[in-house]
Amino acid sequence: MHRRLWLSVAMLVTGASLLVASSFASAAGTSGALKKGGIWKIGTTGASTQVDPQIAYVTTAWWIEYATAAKLYNYPDKSGPAGSKLVPEVASKFAVTNGGKKYTFTIRKGFKFSDGKAVTANSFKYAINRVANHDLASPGAQFITDPTGTNIVGAKAVNDGQGTNVSGVKVKGNKLTINLTKADGTFMAKITMPFFQATSTKLPLTHEVSTVNGPGDLPSAGPYVMTRNDVNQLTSLRQNPNWKPGPGRNRPRNLTGLDLQWNLNEQTAFNQTKANQLDEGPLPAAEVQGVANQYGVNKSRFWTKPVNCTGYLPMNTANNLFKSNLKLRQAVNYAITRSTYVAQAGPYAGQPWTHIFNPGVPGWRNTTIYRKNLAKAKSLAAGHFKDGKITVYYRSSGTTNPAQAAIVKDDLKNLGFSDNNITMKGFSGANIYDAMGKRGNDADMGVSMGWCSDYPDPYDWLNILLYGPSIQDENNVNYSYFNNPTWNRRMAAAAKLVGPKRLKVYGQMDLDIMQKAAPMAIERTYNNRYFFSNRVDTKGLVYQGIYQDWSIPAMALK
């Protein structure tokens, strides 16, 4: 699923407030007792993620970038509420003027990229120009070109191909000024996403960087730098030699580096982790309960943490099968076997769910809107199968994803699709997002798709996942290609609301859109599960709630 960071729930629910700490607190209370050095070895199934900071938009990529990026403001390497407060990093302060439409950041001296070049205000202007660039097609563009949300002056024109310089971003000395078309209380939550980190001009403006052969190929200004990226094989991080403690640079840095191996066999990698040959590895569903029984939960080697994510089956409303076919989309929602689907992931994985907002989304309602009812599903579907053919994209890596795809295929057959008319297309790891994100793909449905919140506001769910005008040629996240004028207007109107009314309207729209439009079938909520070697020092495990994973700079080996 996409990484999706989420901020403290205290942020944005009032429509105006923002938690910003005035100074960087000490990152880890026990960090002084932790061993320095060592390479953290992690293995995973599936294909590798994208690594270009203006392109990468999946969970593992943002976890890595939390270790490599330097941002205007950032989140401390702390768990709980303390980790959800924005603190100054490269910017020492900012001021808001012109009725909330002008943000001026003061950039510190002392930050350097891993290739030795100084980080300046222009490093952030370049990041914004890359995000907005039409040819690069960054998924981050939606966060700065939104007429109902954050809209940087000139960003939409650049994104439409009219030039390469975002006119609303100005640099004068150590001052970075960003002008918005209108005031937006969510701006700081968005400009601190990894898309907008300090970016080296070594990265080409118009095309993606994917291969890294040394520390100079993808310079970064955080505690670590990516020194190698062999696509689908190995991604390596090592300490940034030019990152030294100082103002804004108070983060921990215990490990010498991290090596992430891709495309491993799930059971083999689990066995390697159990034998302490890997420090972190995959956890097959069949092994979860045994590991929990042997090591306990959240004590030594097995850990589980909830995440603000929802799993679903998008139905492509732009392709023939589900286009103008509400009855069939509703039928799928009644036909799927959610409990069996979730069970394929094993214990501690999450629970069945039926609407978009999970319990971590402000405005969510504790209700079940679809229950398994095959008779009703068949009644709704009757006469709406069109040519009877359906193409389903699914994740082929690991054991859980193919098992879930098999459950969905059985559900489709029970609904009335014949076996020989169901085409299953497998994709390794995050490759499924690239395939489904291209407008015009041949998928009618996707399996094992998921969404995790960027920040705790319902806008980040309905308006990002389902707002039609945001659809572009590639890197889409509206995998349903849902573009309905009536619902577009409702989403745009809801985006203008604040406070309790905003949450009430969005909470009802979540239920309404699932019942009356059904562009997807919701399957589940999620927990993260982790299995470690006995080399891992649990005192260094800091679960960063924003990135919903362990902080790499805080991690340590015994």
Report the location of each language-model feature.
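Detector for C-terminal structural segments
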Residues: 335-365, 399-409, 435-558
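Ligand-site clamp/hinge motif
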Residues: 209-215, 242-291
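Aromatic- and charge-enriched surface segment that lines or borders ligand/interaction sites
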Residues: 92-143, 177, 322-324
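Short helices/loops that flank or line small-molecule/ion binding pockets
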Residues: 116-118, 123, 267-279, 285, ...
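Alpha-helical secondary-structure segments
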Residues: 41, 119-129, 173-179, 183, ...
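Surface-exposed binding/hinge segments that line
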Residues: 106, 123-125, 133-202
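N-terminal lobe/hinge region of extracytoplasmic solute-binding protein
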Residues: 43-98, 219
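Gly/Pro-rich hinge or "lid" segments in bacterial periplasmic/extracellular proteins
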Residues: 77-81, 183-250, 257
